[in-house]
């Protein structure tokens, strides 16, 4: 167990070091869901939340493609946005079932296309009670020195919308 936690810490730390020792900024969204954490984690753990969000937001996401993998660590996922001229590609680098944490590192697109040197997306499913939890979505990012004056930021709205979609989907299926 200690080895797993140490490895996860090392992996996340290595990604943060990829920001060339720049200070990481964070955008965070939290949403309470009246469903147990295990049910929410089932949706977030692999590709379920990406597929559900694409299905529910066809005016935002044109399609999703799995470029590598099966939804586990190492999976590379590409989201193409409407009207199809922009995209975002990420690699799942941590999936921790015990802590219900999923981390993805941006590879291209998103804020990387407008001046960020690193973009790391993390989902934490935090149990509150047996039938309630919090979906915490966090984007950590660093801005390249030459773009600091422009203050580029990733957009957390899609992650917030995905959490709302998950909430509606899971709470309605509980009834």
Residues of each region from the PLM?
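Hydrophobic ligand-binding cavity/cleft-lining segments
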Residues: 2-70
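Intrinsic-disorder/low-complexity, polar/charged segments enriched in Ser/Thr/Lys/Arg/Asp/Glu/Gln
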Residues: 24-30, 61, 74-76, 87, ...
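Hydrophobic/aromatic beta-strand elements that line small-molecule binding cavities or substrate pockets
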Residues: 29-31, 88-94, 118-127
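A short, structured loop/turn motif at beta-sheet edges
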Residues: 37-38, 69, 93-101, 124-134
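Hydrophobic pocket/interface hotspot
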Residues: 40-44, 77, 92, 104, ...
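Short amphipathic alpha-helical signal-transduction/dimerization elements
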Residues: 48, 160-175
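Glycine-rich portal/gate segments that line the openings of hydrophobic small-molecule binding cavities
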Residues: 51-55, 61-112, 173
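Beta-strand/loop substructures that line and gate deep hydrophobic ligand-binding cavities in soluble
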Residues: 103-161
């Amino acid at each position: 167990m200690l080895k797993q936690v140490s490895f996860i810490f090392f992996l996340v730390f290595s990604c943060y070091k990829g920001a060339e020792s720049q200070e990481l900024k964070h955008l965070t969204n939290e949403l309470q869901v009246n469903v147990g954490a295990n049910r929410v984690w089932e949706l977030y753990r692999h590709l379920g939340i990406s597929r559900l969000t694409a299905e529910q937001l066809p005016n935002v996401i044109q399609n999703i493609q799995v470029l590598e993998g099966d939804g586990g660590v190492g999976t590379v996922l590409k989201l193409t946005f409407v009207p199809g001229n922009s995209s975002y590609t990420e690699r799942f680098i941590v999936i921790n079932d015990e802590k219900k944490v999923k981390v993805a590192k941006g590879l291209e697109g998103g804020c990387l296309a407008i001046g960020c040197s690193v973009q790391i997306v993390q989902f934490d499913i935090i149990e509150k009670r047996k039938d309630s939890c919090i979906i915490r979505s966090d984007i950590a990012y660093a801005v390249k020195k030459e773009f600091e004056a422009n203050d580029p930021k990733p957009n957390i709205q899609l992650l917030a919308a995905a959490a709302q979609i998950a909430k509606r989907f899971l709470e309605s299926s509980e009834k």
